[in-house]
A protein has these predicted regions:
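Inter-helical junctions in multi-pass inner-membrane proteins, predominant
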Residues: 63-74, 169, 173, 255-268, ...
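Membrane-helix/interface signature in polytopic inner-membrane proteins
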Residues: 220-234, 276-316
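Alpha-helical transmembrane segments within multi-pass membrane transporters and channels
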Residues: 121-162, 372-373, 377
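Transmembrane alpha-helical segments in multi-pass inner-membrane proteins
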Residues: 97, 316-329, 333-396
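Transmembrane alpha-helical segments of polytopic membrane transport and secretion proteins
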Residues: 1-45, 218-249, 410-415
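Transmembrane helix-bundle core of multi-pass membrane transporters
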Residues: 164-282, 339
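Single transmembrane alpha-helix segments in multi-pass membrane proteins
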Residues: 55-120, 142-154, 169, 282, ...
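Membrane-interfacial amphipathic/re-entrant helices at transmembrane-helix boundaries
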Residues: 21-84, 120-126
Length: 415
């Protein structure tokens, strides 16, 4: 068992671990070690710096509108379903596959939810469970063709995109269906209750954000200590501290902005919980290491004893569930299901993962990177809309950003 775990760990090529390459030695000067580490991990630090730079740019060009509490709340609500799907898409890409059907599945599940709750008056809790199980079944069907029948994921999910786009039209009969029950709408339109109010600031939301930041810092520190105890190389202490303090500061600052409006949205709590769950799964569980091993070198992973077919199958089941959840969140936000819901979502989700550092060849990517990538896309969309940039040029700019991100990844890999 220990040898197998060691073999799995050795197959992970820069995925969830974030370990530095062996370009330095303990005897190397501190400055040289820092420079070498930054050179080999520029992707990780570049993502955070890029997000901060983009936010600063649009904050000043929009005369401060971008970081107004109302607009920050809208940013969270507008990008929540993209972030949710990006978590699943990251695992699919890391495993060496792609899923083009997530947008159509998202729209189909929203349509199914509308028919169940509005037309058949099914209790919203039961309807949500049915929709999530439907997403799992869709992922299982596509996963079987990909993992066991060996049909390329591009073809299977392209077919799925067409099938579920058509099924959404059929279920809705070409019309919009709504409104949803008020309880269901709270998924996207509700905010956590506030037990304290101080000069217009929802103190409960702010304190919760501060607690989340503190928990993140402690978790990262414990993870670092655990890796060091196993003799694995880690990033220099000052870089580790600076990066995580920056993340914590951003969380606290955004919590303050949200608390200055209506508080933390319910969907942000769902999204944050999923982020923590998937970050833990990819960094500290056996199945997480095996997914990175599968994407890094499928043949070697199979020889090491990993059941690669079953792992790929469950990766798509997971993607189906998250696409269904995103469909419910999006439908609740619109308060109606439309035949065009989910159109083009898969492009934003895939772009978020690649911009966030996932490798097109598989085996590389981080949860926090996918989330940052999603918010880079969201901030760009929001900022350009505030500035009055047309949708045509918005698409051009987003395409260029995606191409640049993938080019940098390929360039660094070929150096």
């Amino acid at each position: 068992m220990e040898r197998r775990a060691a073999a799995e760990q050795s197959l992970v090529e820069g995925g969830g671990s974030g370990a530095a390459t062996s370009g330095t030695t303990p005897a190397a000067p501190v400055q040289t070690r820092y420079i070498e580490y930054l050179k080999h991990n520029m992707r990780e630090y570049g993502m955070l710096l890029s997000l901060l730079a983009i936010m600063a740019f649009f904050h000043f060009t929009t005369d401060g509108t971008l970081l107004q509490p109302l607009n920050v709340t809208n940013l969270v609500l507008q990008n929540s379903y993209i972030v949710i799907m990006a978590l699943g898409m990251l695992l699919v890409i890391v495993a060496g596959h792609i899923d083009l059907s997530v947008g159509s599945v998202c729209g189909f599940v929203g349509a199914l939810a509308a028919v169940l709750m509005v037309q058949y008056e099914v209790n919203f809790v039961l309807a949500v469970i049915i929709c999530l199980l439907t997403g799992a079944a869709i992922g299982a069907i596509q996963g079987w063709f990909i993992a066991f029948a060996k049909v390329p994921s591009f073809i299977v999910t392209l077919a799925g995109m067409l099938i579920f786009k058509g099924l959404a039209l059929a279920v809705l009969q070409g019309q919009s269906v709504g409104p949803f029950p008020s309880e269901f709408q709270l998924i996207s339109s509700g905010f956590i209750p506030d037990f304290f109010a101080v000069d217009g600031v929802r103190l409960t939301s702010f304190l919760l954000g501060a607690v989340i930041a503190a928990v993140m810092l402690v978790s990262r520190l414990r993870s670092r200590q655990s890796r060091i105890s196993y003799g694995m190389e880690e990033e220099p202490w000052l870089l580790f501290l600076a990066k995580n303090l920056a993340f914590a500061t951003i969380i606290v600052f955004l919590s303050y902005l949200l608390a200055s409006y209506k508080g933390l949205p319910n969907v942000l709590i769902v999204m944050g919980g999923l982020m923590l769950l998937y970050d833990f799964a990819t960094n500290r569980t056996t199945i997480g290491r095996r997914i990175y091993a599968l994407g890094g070198n499928p043949k070697a992973a199979k020889l090491s004893g990993i059941k690669t077919e079953r792992l790929a199958f469950y990766t798509f089941v997971n993607m189906g569930v998250l696409a269904a959840l995103a469909g419910l969140v999006f439908a609740a936000r619109l308060n109606t299901a439309t035949p065009k819901a989910g159109l083009g979502f898969e492009l934003d989700v895939i772009a978020a993962c690649f911009i966030g550092g996932a490798s097109a060849s598989g085996g590389v990517g981080k949860v926090i990177g996918a989330v940052i990538g999603a918010f880079i896309m969201g901030v760009m969309n929001n900022g350009m809309s505030i500035l009055g940039v047309g949708i045509d040029y918005q698409q051009v700019i987003k395409g260029l950003v995606l191409l640049a991100a993938v080019y940098i990844d390929v360039y660094n890999k070929n150096k």
